Amino acid sequence: MRRAALWLWLCALALRLQPVLPQIVTVNVPPEDQDGSGDDSDNFSGSGTGALPDITLSRQASPTLKDVWLLTATPTAPEPTSRDAQATTTSILPAAEKPGEGEPVLTAEVDPGFTARDKESEVTTRPRETTQLLITHWVSTARATTAQAPVTSHPHRDVQPGLHETSAPTAPGQPDQQPPSGGTSVIKEVAEDGATNQLPTGEGSGEQDFTFETSGENTAVAAVEPDQRNQPPVDEGATGASQGLLDRKEVLGGVIAGGLVGLIFAVCLVGFMLYRMKKKDEGSYSLEEPKQANGGAYQKPTKQEEFYA
């Protein structure tokens, strides 16, 4: 065990003492001028500020490779404790979140004072903390969902203003209280009224949490409106004026008197026409005594006088 720890320490020290060689990458590379004559200098930017400075980028080797190598080399020890550590790491790491690119999986610093057992204990304790965080997060989400339950069921209880609630909403930690003897009937009535007052799916928003109250007067008006739409339009001004004239007594009396006079005149006219038709059948249209048939003929005198010669 001591030999393995010594070899690990020497390898880590050798990796740390290696110099980091920066890789210089030249970014400012001017394009090839094929149209020009070649006399002009290509070191200018064209904006009048002078020559372009050379920009270099340096890359440093990340120290994560040696840490991963140390962790993979740790389970090679012959003691059973290293196997236990390997089993714990392999069973817990898949449950944790996947690391991003370039991020170390498990960071472990190597110091001269640490031994292999200290490294194993550090490796085994860190994944356990991640599992505890996952458990607390799951409990917090469960509490949030239970707290939202009374809020979603609250609009169904306000369907009718006449019905009063019999039980208050319970907290997430408290058990559900049983309603009194009349509680079940009240809940059933509210559910039935809510089902009848809900809007159809084609007109509403598609959610059953929102309900609207409708009274008997509104339904009666809705039933009468289609009948009124089918009737032809009526001039309201003319009907109002005629009703106003008929309400007056003078106008009503004049209308009745005119009707009676017209009736009498019609009867007289019909009687006169009948009388003329009767006279026509008799052959005389005059109302005087009839004349003689011979007209102006000479008539012998009835008295005769005697003459002597």
Swiss-Prot record:
Residues 173-183 have a biased composition (Low complexity). It is a single-pass type I membrane protein. PROSITE patterns: SYNDECAN. GO terms for molecular function: cargo receptor activity; identical protein binding. The modification Phosphoserine is found at residue 284. Keywords: Glycoprotein, Heparan sulfate, Membrane, Phosphoprotein, Proteoglycan, Secreted, Signal, Transmembrane, Transmembrane helix. Residues 1-22 form the signal peptide. The record marks 241-242 as: Cleavage. Residues 23-253 are extracellular. SMART domains: 4.1m. Cell surface proteoglycan that contains both heparan sulfate and chondroitin sulfate and that links the cytoskeleton to the interstitial matrix. Regulates exosome biogenesis in concert with SDCBP and PDCD6IP. Able to induce its own expression in dental mesenchymal cells and also in the neighboring dental epithelial cells via an MSX1-mediated pathway. Interacts with CDCP1. Interacts (via C-terminus) with TIAM1 (via PDZ domain). Interacts with MDK. This is Syndecan-1. The lineage of its organism: Eukaryota, Metazoa, Chordata, Craniata, Vertebrata.
